Amino acid sequence: MKKFIVAAIAASMALPVYAADLGGRVLNIGSDTTYPPHEFIEDGVVKGFDVDVVAEICERINCTPNWVTTAWDGIFAALADGQFDMVVSGVTITDERDKIVDFSDPYIIVQQGVLMRVEDEGATIDAFKSGDLRLASQNG
């Protein structure tokens, strides 16, 4: 499960409109586009809240976003390798990630929680350790 703090979005959000003009440059943006309502694909087009935020940033700094759908478990390595200019996707800022990428200030923070079936209410960590219950999460 990932805490939603968006990373590496080019700290331009805090800059005045006149501070940057990228001259229409195309910015390649890596995203795991499977996280609605933040980023998802509908009718072959990347849509969502993050897409709208990036569109506004690009409007202000004169750039064109090019969304590159990428698997979550390799997204930071691909960014560090130069495959994109930035990553815009649900991201938890960690010390490990901070060593390989630069983070912007977060523009949204969403709480995390654990979901479980009603009939498993009151389950303990021992139930997971014994194999009576299973836990699923996303890699990366």
Language-model features, listed with the residues they occupy:
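Gram-negative bacterial Sec-dependent N-terminal signal peptides
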Residues: 1-19
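Immediate post-signal peptide segment of exported/extracytoplasmic ligand-binding proteins
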Residues: 17-45, 121-122, 126-134
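Residue-level recognition of the GNAT/N-acetyltransferase active site
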Residues: 32, 117, 138
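Short, polar/charged alpha-helical segment
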Residues: 40-62
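Solvent-exposed, acidic/flexible segments
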Residues: 46-51, 68-72, 121, 136-140
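Acidic, polar ligand-binding/catalytic clefts
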Residues: 55, 59, 64-129
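Short, well-ordered beta-strand core segments
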Residues: 87, 134-135
